[in-house]
């Protein structure tokens, strides 16, 4: 198999990829939407690479309430922080759509015997960059959920998505329930607020496709 198009393997050559094979246990799997890849509470030993599709990182409390912390798209990784630090997973990784996932045993990749290898240095450098990107994504969610109203959370999130897309027309990686879980609001209340915002001419939407028309007064 050729080197997957993923951020964690940036700069890894075909030769280095072949050298990495014996260092860890790699497994490829197909996951239907809604299927759990890493279960909350289980020991963390592997990281996942999204080859196609997408994954939601979520937390479920003792009462069964779900919060989506982030979305991981194709070419991105998940679970690497917990695999490096060990212990039980405080979150779950669930397929957001039909997805192809590569799972890798992290401890094997970081063994001291490979310290002089070029691929390990590249891998560690890539992981540092990934950590920084994920810290930024976490900050973005904190900004969204700090707004006191559903409309405020929607505007913060959708505005950020528009900036990232470089256009007032864009797609988001969530369906309605996933968006509600990400913003930590009730789905029915979210749908009603979206309808009101559309009626007021603030935006248009169809499924996960949005068009921002104008900002409300005062913003």
Show the residue positions of the predicted features.
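Cyclic-nucleotide recognition modules
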Residues: 24, 70-129
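Cyclic nucleotide-binding regulatory module and flanking cytosolic helices
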Residues: 1-36, 82-84
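An amphipathic alpha-helical interaction segment
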Residues: 126-136, 153-160
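Short helix-to-loop capping/linker segments positioned immediately adjacent to catalytic or ligand/cofactor-binding
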Residues: 91, 111-120, 137-146, 164-167
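Phosphate-/nucleic-acid-contacting segments
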Residues: 150-153, 157-219
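Cyclic nucleotide-binding regulatory domains
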Residues: 35-97
């Amino acid at each position: 198999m050729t080197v997957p198009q993923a951020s964690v393997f940036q700069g890894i050559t075909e030769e280095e990829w072949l050298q990495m094979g014996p260092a860890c246990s790699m497994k490829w799997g197909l996951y239907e939407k809604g299927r759990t890849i890493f279960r909350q509470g289980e020991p963390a030993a592997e990281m996942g690479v999204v080859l196609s599709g997408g994954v939601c990182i979520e937390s479920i409390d003792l009462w069964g309430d779900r919060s989506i912390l982030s979305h991981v798209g194709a070419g991105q990784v998940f679970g690497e922080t917990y695999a490096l630090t060990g212990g039980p997973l405080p979150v779950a990784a669930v397929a957001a759509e039909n997805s192809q996932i590569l799972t890798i045993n992290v401890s094997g990749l970081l063994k001291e015997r490979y310290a002089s290898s070029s691929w390990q240095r590249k891998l560690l450098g890539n992981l540092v960059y990934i950590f920084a990107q994920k810290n930024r994504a976490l900050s973005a969610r904190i900004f969204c959920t700090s707004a006191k109203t559903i409309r405020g959370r929607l505007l913060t999130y959708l505005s950020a998505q528009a900036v990232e897309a470089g256009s007032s027309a864009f797609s988001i990686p969530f369906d309605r329930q996933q968006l509600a879980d990400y913003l930590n609001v009730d789905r029915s209340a979210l749908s009603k607020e979206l309808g009101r915002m559309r009626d007021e001419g603030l935006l248009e939407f169809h499924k996960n496709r949005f068009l921002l028309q104008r900002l409300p007064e005062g913003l």
